[in-house]
UniProtKB/Swiss-Prot annotation:
The keyword Repressor does not apply. GO terms for molecular function: monoatomic cation transmembrane transporter activity. This is Putative transport protein APP7_1021. It comes from the Bacteria. It is a multi-pass membrane protein. It is found in: Cell membrane. It comes from Actinobacillus pleuropneumoniae serotype 7 (strain AP76). Belongs to the AAE transporter (TC 2.A.81) family. YidE subfamily.
Length: 552
């Protein structure tokens, strides 16, 4: 067999063995994708015994390309919600998540200095202790540029030694917080639900009868504060006739308007217009329909809603717009993106015409456009290679192959589309790309680390590494957990999701979800902190590597 054939065969064997190990669960907890690392270590131990040598350059390429695929697909997945998570309700959760990341970084620096732990070892322990594989890749890259030798093998070993307690430590932290604070799970779930209902700001509807005599005879656009209030006037009922109004529709006293918007804004408009009306303005039994359509026509990507002139040409109103799972109030200045779901109100024939304009080709939502993927990866690699020179640093700071594609993917996913290129990826395709990338990366890391892993693990040095990893895992979680619970008054279920998200650990999230079956509190906080934490976990080891290298 050729060298390439041998490497591909061994990688396949590592993936099969590692994924099987990852599926083994003890009381519902397993290694997950981390099992691939241990599969690589086992196969590497065997190849070392039989004297099989693998081409280092080929392995290095596979490792780096796998990392690029993984972080890029992560960025595309979380990009639409990344910037939103930094606002309002997400600030508190992200603040505590940053606290966990920051404390772990401080502990790394202290352990490195106090116990004279080699930099590659402590960075590998750090990545394993926080169960974050991209941070391992980021640390390996920057240390290689700094001139370190045998980086991959040493960091891979220390990562693997610290990884198991990285998972166990999160679960232990959740359990201790629950015991110490005597948490009542049912009560916590009820309090969370009550709080969510009070804070919920989704779109609401309201029927208002025009009783203000000063507005009779005015056009819709002449209503006081018409432009300043983000309200959609989707239907108007006059006597028994239902019409779709536009800005030039003349209002009569007694008209019933169907409004869509946020509850507080609807209340303000009711005070201006008149009184709430208990009248049905349903399209049933009329010539009008209310239907959903998805934007898939590349000719309308980036076009503002007002440029389509749907009201003027077709008497169709967009009453709601759903983008990446978030309901938005459409306005004329809003640009359409691929995958936007529009709620259309109008005559059936007009709606069909609008469908043809915006596309509404659901099969396109399942198709993967390959060109934008490679455009994004290429731009990410270029960004990651750009040097940022800081006085006093021995090397230029770079985002690297882990940070560059991540940042570009976050930005492109937020933008959505440029011309005919769109960065929407079906969830199944994104998951497949992400899993392939991480399996390739971990397989190679395991193959490089496995030769001396067992000897290191059983040595006093290996036991010390496990201890350092336990400290880096446990102390930030338990300290932040106590602070969030005592001073932040955080709900326990949300706290469990926060701890899981701060360690970017899906097995821990699965455990947190099982604390209260069918409850979404943990998953919600996990999703809120995950994007920012993933970014910080990739940047932090690079900063630590440069700062500690400079200080030594």
């Amino acid at each position: 067999m050729s060298d390439i054939a041998i490497i591909v065969s061994l990688l396949s064997l590592v993936a099969v063995l590692g994924l099987w190990i990852g599926h083994i669960k003890i009381k519902g907890v397993g290694l997950g994708i981390g099992g691939v690392l241990f599969g690589g270590i086992i196969i590497s131990h065997c190849t070392h015994l039989y004297g099989i040598e693998l081409d280092a350059h080929t392995l290095h390429f596979i490792q780096e390309f796998g990392l690029i695929l993984f972080v890029y697909s992560i960025g595309i997945q979380v990009g639409p919600g990344f910037f939103a998570s930094l606002r309002q309700s997400g600030l508190k959760l992200n603040g505590f998540a940053v606290m966990i990341v920051g404390l772990s970084g401080i502990l790394v620096a202290l352990i490195h200095k106090l116990f004279d732990v080699p930099l590659p070892v402590i960075l590998g322990i750090f990545s394993g202790a926080v169960t974050n594989t991209p941070s391992l890749g980021a640390g390996q890259q920057v240390l290689t540029e700094l001139g370190g030798d045998n980086i991959t093998a040493v960091m891979g070993m220390s990562y693997a030694i610290a990884y198991p307690f990285g998972i166990i430590g999160i679960l232990l932290s959740m359990w201790l917080i629950r015991i110490i604070f005597k948490v009542n799970i049912d009560k916590e779930a009820q309090e969370f639900d009550n709080n969510q209902n009070q804070q919920k700001e989704g779109l609401d509807t309201l029927n208002v009868r025009l009783t203000n005599p000063n507005l009779g005879g005015l056009k819709l656009k002449e209503i006081p504060d018409f432009e300043s209030h983000t309200v959609i006037y989707s239907r108007l009922k006059r006597n028994d006739q239902l019409i779709v109004p536009n800005v030039d529709t003349v209002l009569n006293v007694g008209d019933v308007l169907h409004l869509v918007g946020e509850k507080a804004t609807l209340h303000k408009m009711q005070l201006i217009l008149g009184e709430e009306a208990d009248v049905s303005v349903s399209t049933r039994g009329t010539i009008f329909r209310s239907e959903r359509a998805v934007v898939t026509n590349e000719n309308v990507f980036g076009k503002k809603i007002r440029h389509l002139m749907l009201k003027g040409k077709y008497e169709v109103v967009i009453s709601r717009l759903n983008r990446a799972g978030v309901e938005l109030i459409p306005n004329g200045e809003m640009a359409l993106q691929f995958g936007d779901v529009l709620n259309l109100v109008g005559r059936q024939e007009d709606i069909e015409t609008v469908r043809a304009i915006i596309g509404d080709a659901h099969q396109k939502l399942q198709q993967v456009q390959m060109l934008p993927i490679f455009v994004g990866i290429g731009l990410g690699v270029l960004l990651g290679s750009l040097p940022l020179y800081i006085p006093g640093f021995p090397v230029a700071l770079k985002l690297g192959l882990a940070g560059g594609p991540l940042v570009v993917a976050l930005i492109l996913a937020r933008i959505g589309s440029i011309g005919k290129l769109y960065w929407f990826m079906p969830p199944s395709a994104n998951l497949a790309l992400r899993e392939i990338g991480i399996v390739l990366f971990l397989s190679v890391v395991g193959l490089k680390a496995g030769a001396n892993f067992l000897d290191t693990l059983l040595s006093p040095e290996g036991l010390a590494w496990m201890g350092y990893g336990a400290i880096i895992t446990f102390i930030p979680l338990i300290v932040t957990g106590f602070v969030a619970r005592i001073y932040g008054k955080m709900n326990y279920l949300s706290l469990c999701g926060l701890l899981s998200g701060a360690m970017t650990d899906p097995p821990a999230l699965a455990f947190a979800n099982e604390i209260k079956d069918g409850h979404g509190a943990a998953a919600l906080s996990y999703a809120t902190v995950y994007p920012l934490v993933m970014f910080l976990r990739i940047i932090l080891p690079q900063l630590l590597a440069i700062l500690l290298w400079t200080a030594s």
